[in-house]
A protein has these predicted regions:
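Extracellular/periplasmic Venus flytrap/periplasmic-binding protein
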Residues: 86, 130-131, 137-246, 285-293, ...
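Periplasmic-binding protein-like
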Residues: 91-103, 124-126, 164-169, 222-233, ...
Length: 427
């Protein structure tokens, strides 16, 4: 009798223990962090991992979300593009995360995207990209081309009188598509083929001598020349060093970069870079109270007052706060409900004002041009008068000029053809 009773008691105790574990597991809301912590993109992405950890920590200090603590789950896709898809699946299926913040390169995003669509999860992508995409499961808080590349070219043309153009990029989808858009845009402005030079290099490229020599020659033929750079990752370090080595100053041939910010400059000798430009939607030097508080919080969290902030960090900050607001409004972390609740959410950005999530899953943001200073910071030399709405499909490519995106129900289409009146999907 006692033996049978003890057996039942043991079974009951085990059941309670297992049940308790289930309750505890469901007691947190899991946030996936999918940024490269090793490989060629670690120079840029490691900081974004730390940014999300800071935001999770701050939210937990406010009481968490829906009465639960947030739990960050960090993985390292190691700058290996197929591994991004594997790690995304691991986060969603095995770790049961409710949202993922991750990616930098477009090839990493393209690798992950089918996984998020298959499993109907949510990805916040915080980096400027080439556009030509709108997915139900991705929220793009970085700049589309009309929020960075096009305004930068306008600035060079209108303010600096640039007539010849070097479009230099890393050899993958973001630079190639962005430069395709820019080439079409430049030609629409009357720039001829002979005044456009296009060059691509692999990730991690280190020998820039002959390429920079070609750029120097191209810029010495009588017309004011600029380089529009979509070079990504650690290849930027030897690129700028070679510019300095060949005596190319910002007055001779200015470079405007779309993937060089404070983080990349923090590890470089900036003496040869002074006066060159970058186009972003945020700089650490922005003079607002919100930015001052963000920088202070960052230094406190990272325990290093020398660490910088940059544009993708702000995009992560905006995306995280949008997600928190949408989950709060929806009263659940259910992906379908949160996707619907995100449209129309407006949160403060760090440049002043509010950024809004649009039906095409892009946001409104200001556009800033900054000039590199000798301390690795940027002096803001130009900015848009208001916020610019992100455009998923470029007006300057014939195949996409007729496409329109809205995920608002009942429309729910990422690529609606206004001529055929048919939806052709999202990307």
């Amino acid at each position: 009798m006692n033996k049978a009773f003890n057996t039942k008691l043991a079974v009951l105790s085990l059941a309670l223990t297992l049940g308790s574990g289930v309750v505890q597991a469901a007691d947190t809301i899991k946030v996936g962090v999918l940024h490269s912590l090793s490989g060629t993109m670690a120079i840029s992405e490691t900081t974004l991992k730390d940014t999300v950890l800071m935001l999770v920590d701050e939210q937990n200090k406010k009481g968490g979300l829906l009465g639960k603590k947030l739990e960050a789950v960090v993985v390292d896709p190691a700058s290996n593009w197929p591994l991004f898809a594997e790690k995304a699946r691991e986060l969603i299926e095995k770790e049961k995360v409710d949202v993922v913040f991750g990616g930098w390169t477009s090839v990493s995003r393209k690798s992950m995207l089918p996984v998020f669509e298959e499993l109907n999860s949510i990805l916040f992508y915080p980096v400027q990209y080439e556009g030509e995409e709108s997915s139900k499961n991705v929220f793009y808080t970085g700049a589309a081309p009309n929020q960075q590349a096009i305004p930068a070219v306008d600035y060079l043309m209108d303010e600096l009188g640039i007539e010849r153009w070097v479009l230099a990029g890393t050899d993958y989808v973001y630079p190639r598509t962005t430069n395709k858009i820019l080439e079409a845009y430049l030609k629409s402005k009357g720039v001829s083929d002979k005044d456009i030079m296009i060059n691509y290099t692999p990730f991690g490229h280190s020998d820039w001598q002959s390429i920079v020599s070609d750029v120097k020659k191209f810029g010495s033929e009588g017309k004011k020349t600029a380089v529009v750079s979509t070079i990504n990752g650690d290849a930027n370090v030897p690129f700028y060093k070679e510019l300095g080595a060949q005596g190319i100053s910002s007055e001779d041939i200015p470079v405007v970069a779309f993937s060089v910010g404070e983080e990349e400059l923090s590890g470089m000798d900036t003496s040869a870079l002074v006066g060159h430009l970058a186009a972003w939607n945020y700089f650490m030097s922005v003079d607002t109270q919100a930015n001052e508080e963000f920088v202070e919080a960052w230094h406190k969290f990272i325990k290093d007052d020398k660490r910088v902030t940059n544009d993708p960090m702000e995009a992560s900050y905006i995306g995280f706060n949008m997600w928190v607001q949408a989950v709060t409004n929806a009263g659940t972390t259910d992906p379908e409900a949160v996707q619907d609740a995100l449209i129309g959410v407006a949160v403060p950005n760090l440049s002043g004002g509010y950024s809004t999530m649009l039906p095409n899953h892009h946001i409104t943001k200001p556009v800033l041009i900054g000039e590199i200073q000798d301390d690795g910071q940027f002096d803001i030399v130009w900015e848009t008068k208001g916020l610019v709405a992100g455009d998923a499909w470029s007006d300057f490519l014939p195949e996409s000029a007729k496409l329109f995106s809205s995920w608002s129900k009942p429309f729910s289409c990422g690529a609606f053809n206004v001529e055929t009146k048919k939806c052709s999907g999202g990307n």
